[in-house]
């Protein structure tokens, strides 16, 4: 399986490979076009902790995948809650806040694309 050619971002969530055992698999989660660079981050936030991010330059995007817990991303006029095992893509050229309002440590992967 190869990544589809996309002009815009896409949540794909497609099984790309399955091993002989059920636990062995690769899932293609999302795709975004990139002009320059992609960053891969791991994050963890303790219960009640938050991180306020400054707006990135126009054209920057983030792909989030939650490993454990539940991540809330607060934007100026809205919020998005992402459960463990789910992905979310957003333009990061706005101010936003990562929030762990759950009852366990939050762990997630963050890709920054620009």
What are these regions (language model features)?
Residues 76-93:
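Short acidic-glycine-tyrosine-enriched beta hairpin
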Residues 1-37:
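A short, N-terminal "cap"/entry segment at the start of jelly-roll beta-barrel domains
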Residues 34-38, 49-62:
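A short beta-loop-beta micro-motif enriched in histidine and acidic residues
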Residues 42-45, 56-73:
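Short, conserved beta-strand element in jelly-roll/cupin
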Residues 63, 70-72, 79, 95, ...:
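Structural motif
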Residues 98-101:
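Asparagine-centered strand-capping/turn motif at beta-strand->loop junctions
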Residues 42, 89, 103-114:
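A short hydrophobic beta-strand segment most commonly corresponding to one strand
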């Amino acid at each position: 399986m190869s990544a589809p050619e996309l002009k815009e971002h896409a949540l794909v969530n497609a099984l790309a490979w399955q091993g002989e055992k059920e636990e062995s698999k690769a899932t293609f989660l999302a795709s975004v076009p990139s002009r320059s660079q992609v960053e891969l981050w791991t994050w963890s936030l303790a219960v009640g902790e938050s991180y306020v991010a400054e707006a990135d330059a126009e054209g920057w995007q983030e792909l989030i995948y939650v490993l454990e817990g539940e991540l809330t991303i607060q934007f100026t006029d809205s919020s998005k809650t992402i459960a463990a095992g789910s992905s979310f893509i957003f333009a990061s050229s706005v101010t936003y806040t990562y929030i762990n309002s759950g009852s366990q440590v939050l762990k997630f992967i963050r890709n920054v694309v620009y």
